[in-house]
Structure formats: structure tokens, C-alpha cells
Regions:
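AMP-binding/adenylate-forming catalytic core of the ANL superfamily
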Residues: 1-63, 69-75, 80-89
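Acidic/polar alpha-helix N-cap and adjacent early helical turns
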Residues: 89-97
Length: 97
């Protein structure tokens, strides 16, 4: 089991990351693997491999997100809570927005 909170805390330390949510997405080999949905700081750029390298230095290999999707914002409730179920269920639709 992987704690998304632990992975998110590490990724938030990257200077380009403003917000992040990590969810488990289907994976052929492991059944489910961590995937990072990232909102970048204004003017920042970040390649997926750069974020993975950053995470690899700070996390066990199996906890490093296997993928990354950059979004303009994370889906949230009216009270500001991140809607991870939306990210899990609509990765393709969200990425297209």
C-alpha cells in the first residue's frame, strides 16, 4: 500500500509544483500504480522525467508515480477539497480540458 499523502508531500517540495494529487490508476503489471496530477506554479515548466527523478531521490521506487498529468487546476468541492474520485475516473477527459 502506498500513502498518497506521503507521495504528495514529497512532490510538493519541488519548486515548480504548486498543487498535487496522487491517485492509484490501473496498471497492467501491478494492478494499480500511483499517478500524479500536478498544477504548476505560474511560469513554471516541468518534464515528467524531472519530477520522477526528484521523487526517486526521496521515495522508495515503488512509491514513485508512474505517470504525471499537468492540469491548470485540480477538481475541488465547494469547500476546497480535492475530488480524487474525479481524477481517478476521468483522467482522459480532464487532461483534454
Amino acid at each position: 500500500n502506498i500513502s498518497s499523502i506521503e507521495v504528495e508531500a514529497v512532490l510538493l517540495r519541488h519548486p515548480s509544483v504548486q498543487e498535487v494529487a496522487v491517485v492509484g490508476l490501473p496498471h497492467e503489471k501491478w494492478g494499480e500504480a500511483p499517478h500524479a496530477f500536478v498544477v504548476l506554479r505560474p511560469g513554471a515548466t516541468l518534464a515528467e522525467e524531472e519530477l520522477r527523478a526528484f521523487a526517486r531521490e526521496r521515495l522508495a521506487g515503488f512509491k514513485v508515480p508512474k505517470g504525471m498529468t499537468v492540469l491548470p487546476e485540480l477538481p475541488k468541492t465547494a469547500t476546497g477539497k480535492i475530488q480524487k474520485y474525479v481524477l481517478r475516473g476521468g483522467r482522459t477527459a480532464i487532461a483534454a480540458q
